[in-house]
A protein has these predicted regions:
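S4-like RNA-binding module at protein N-termini
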Residues: 27-69
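A basic, amphipathic helix-loop patch mediating RNA/tRNA/ribosome contacts
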Residues: 1-43
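A general secondary-structure boundary signal
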Residues: 4-8, 57, 79
């Protein structure tokens, strides 16, 4: 699944367009690297979101096969950010 679609389907961004812009701006990283919005995501990958409050990193446990609720999407991610 494309990174921009995954970010949107996992409810990390409201839309695929917002996700694409964040990826292009370097605010959304895949496995610690800046990649293109079309880069593939697979279970086990780490998605990092960089913002003013710091960086939040999640491990992808599974990818959605259909549209999910926000609560169901949370079940597909595991927070790995050190607190």
């Amino acid at each position: 699944m494309r990174l921009d679609i995954a970010l949107s389907e996992l409810h990390l961004f409201k839309s695929r367009t917002q996700a694409s812009l964040a990826i292009q701006d370097g605010a959304a990283l895949l496995n610690g690297e800046v990649v293109k919005p079309g880069h593939g995501v697979k279970p086990g990958d780490h998605i990092s979101l960089v913002g003013p409050a710091g960086t939040r990193t999640c491990e992808v446990l599974a990818l959605p096969r259909a549209s999910l609720s926000r609560a169901a999407a949370r079940e597909l991610l595991r927070e790995v950010t050190a607190r």
